[in-house]
């Protein structure tokens, strides 16, 4: 049986439950860069929303919530630094976990008028979220709006997958406990498309210098 993988939480959890059994082996973070496949109902805009695309994803495992949050913050900072190094005008926003589940997540959006997602933010505070999360914000009418292209997403999954798949570790007291999990993804193919949407003119593409194939074309 051969399956196309849209995402790999279950696959990684299955590997970890066979290989990790002690708190001494944690925390640990696995990552990969490979092709993903998703049954998009309406694939469009080239590699912006395709059924096949290149993605970097990673999955971290932890003994407790503080350990998970520490790694989550590191990944948030790392993703921000990656997008800054590329030269993208982006914003990290609070997001809904959706079908993946868990307790908290952030999306990273390249700002572009052609973006599929509506984002809202406050000019007075550091609040920023996608419009779905901001539905019940007390000052929603005062929030500014913009559009973005999602190029990254990070999640605190907690024990959603480990409990369902019985992925456990033995703690300091010799008792079995479910692993806590985080997952983190960057759409490698979509970054290129988003950079084009954000930076171009009537003559064509103006790539940020960090990802431009050439500095000068004659």
Regions found by a protein language model. Give the residues of each.
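TRNA-recognition modules of translation machinery and tRNA-sensing kinases, especially anticodon-binding
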Residues: 1-218
């Amino acid at each position: 049986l051969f399956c196309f993988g849209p995402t790999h939480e279950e696959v990684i959890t299955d590997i970890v439950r066979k290989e990790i059994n002690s708190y001494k082996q944690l925390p640990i973070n696995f990552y990969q860069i490979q092709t993903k496949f998703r049954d998009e109902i309406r694939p469009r805009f080239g590699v912006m929303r395709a059924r096949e695309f290149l993605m970097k994803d990673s999955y971290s495992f932890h003994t407790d919530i503080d350990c998970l949050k520490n790694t989550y913050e590191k990944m948030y900072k790392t993703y921000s630094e990656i997008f800054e190094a590329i030269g993208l005008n982006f914003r990290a926003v609070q997001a809904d976990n959706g079908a993946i589940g868990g307790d908290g997540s952030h999306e990273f959006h390249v700002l572009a008028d052609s973006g599929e997602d509506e984002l809202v933010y406050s000019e007075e505070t550091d609040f920023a979220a996608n419009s779905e999360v901001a539905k019940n914000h007390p000052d929603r009418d005062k929030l500014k709006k913009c559009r973005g292209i999602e190029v990254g997403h990070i999640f605190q999954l907690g024990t959603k997958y480990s409990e369902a798949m019985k992925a456990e570790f033995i703690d300091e007291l010799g008792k079995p406990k479910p692993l806590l999990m985080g997952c983190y993804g960057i759409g490698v193919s979509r970054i290129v498309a988003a950079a084009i949407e954000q930076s171009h003119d009537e003559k064509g593409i103006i790539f940020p210098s960090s990802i431009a194939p050439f500095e000068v074309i004659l």
